[in-house]
Amino acid sequence: MRELPDIEDQRGLVSTSQLRTAGWSRSAISRFVRSRGWSPLPGVVYGHRTTLDDDQRVIAGWLWAGPASALTGGWGLVRHGLVLAARPVLRRFVVADPCHSRVVDDVEVLHVHHAPTFRNLSGVPVVPLDRALIDYARGFEATADSVRAVTIRALQTGLTSPARLEAALGETRPNGTRGIRSGLIDFERGAWSVPEAQLLRILSRRRPRLKLQMNPRLVDTSGRLIGVPDCYLPDHRVAIQVHSWTHHAGFHGARDQWADTVDADARYIPHGIAVLPVSPTVLRDHPERFLRLLDGVLLAQQGRAKVDIRIEVAVEPTPLAPHAS
């Protein structure tokens, strides 16, 4: 029996249209599926009886959607390199005229009036990250809070920029984009994560007189980097570190990332900087506990000798509108 053609980047998957172009008859395709492979989606053939991994499922979805389609939504974000908190459910694609919207299983094809721009990422055409993020939000693939977190992550990692994201938002209706807009505001105020945005909001509301800077580079007089605290209070020489096990656990190569995170806090002490660690859970559920600890640290720092340091690339947060406490 004939072997399936090995098409680059398709990982053993072939569309029946490609097989017909290669000279396969309908009966030959049917015999192959019955005897050796299987069809994960209509018009798509896989040459083994094993299940597909996530990457193969995306490729299969694209083969079903057609060569004029482009991946968008959650799986589009993953293809661009974003790590999502939850595995996307839908494989979502966009197509332009004369194609139509259609759905099968968890694969959805959405019709748009203009052909989408795309990049080929690992064999699959993918819309720009900003468009994928908007479709992810407006398609209700995640909650507004999750979209907010993904937006901040995309900006913080440099996968997009505020200008590009604002331009993309300006080309679409505002409904369904609240999480994106919130994340954009958070990032422009200096936050690199949702917990940091919560910290900024707490301090701006409850301790509005404190001068603070988000994610500044602190260097000593010789220009050597001391660290990049999540939040720095320069008048009191206090570094606030939001320590999340979710984001800092695990290994990078042979290095324990959590141990490195904790050890890094010790670098501030010789420079007269007090470190106040706080967890995202405390910021979210017990802000008063955090504020009591902060007040104690501020009091302890009064009158302590100051060591010369320099602040680089500090972001001054925009004052938040007042809220009722």
Task: Spell out what each predicted region is.
Residues L155, L159-S325:
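Surface segments flanking catalytic/ligand-binding clefts of nucleic-acid enzymes
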